[in-house]
C-alpha cells in the first residue's frame, strides 16, 4: 500500500489517530509523549498510533497530506487537530 493510501485509510477507519515518533508506550520525542499524556488524561480511548519512524515515506507524506511540517499530528473524527 502506498504511503498516501495508508494515511487516508488510517484516518478514515479510526476515530482518533496520532502520527507520532515512537509508540504510546515508548514515545521518542517530548512532543509525542505530551500528546499521549493529554489524550490519556482526557479519558480518550481507542487511540490509533502510527510510528512515523518506522516508515520514512509515511513520515514525509503525512506532512504533505496535512500541509503541516511537524510531527506529532493528531486527527480526531477525520479532522486535523494539530501537531
What function would you assign to each model-found segment?
Residues 6-7, 68:
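Short acidic, glycine/proline-enriched helix-loop-strand junctions
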Residues 7-46:
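Local sequence-structure signature of Cys/Sec-based thiol-disulfide redox active-site neighborhoods
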Residues 3-5, 59:
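Eukaryotic intrinsically disordered and solvent-exposed regulatory patches
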Residues 62-63:
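The conserved cystathionine-beta-synthase
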Residues 40, 44-59, 68-69:
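Thiol-based oxidoreductase modules, predominantly thioredoxin-like and allied folds used
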Residues 19-21, 50-55, 77:
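Structured beta-strand/turn binding interfaces of compact recognition modules in eukaryotic regulators
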Residues 70-83:
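A short, hydrophobic beta-strand/beta-hairpin element that forms part of a small beta-sheet core
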Amino acid at each position: 500500500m502506498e504511503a498516501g493510501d495508508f494515511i487516508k485509510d488510517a484516518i478514515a477507519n479510526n476515530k482518533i489517530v496520532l502520527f507520532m515518533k515512537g509508540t504510546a508506550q515508548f514515545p521518542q520525542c517530548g512532543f509525542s509523549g505530551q500528546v499521549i499524556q493529554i489524550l490519556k488524561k482526557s479519558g480518550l480511548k481507542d487511540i490509533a498510533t502510527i510510528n512515523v519512524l518506522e516508515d520514512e515515506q509515511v513520515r514525509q507524506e503525512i506532512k504533505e497530506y496535512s500541509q503541516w511540517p511537524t510531527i506529532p499530528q493528531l486527527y480526531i473524527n477525520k479532522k486535523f487537530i494539530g501537531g
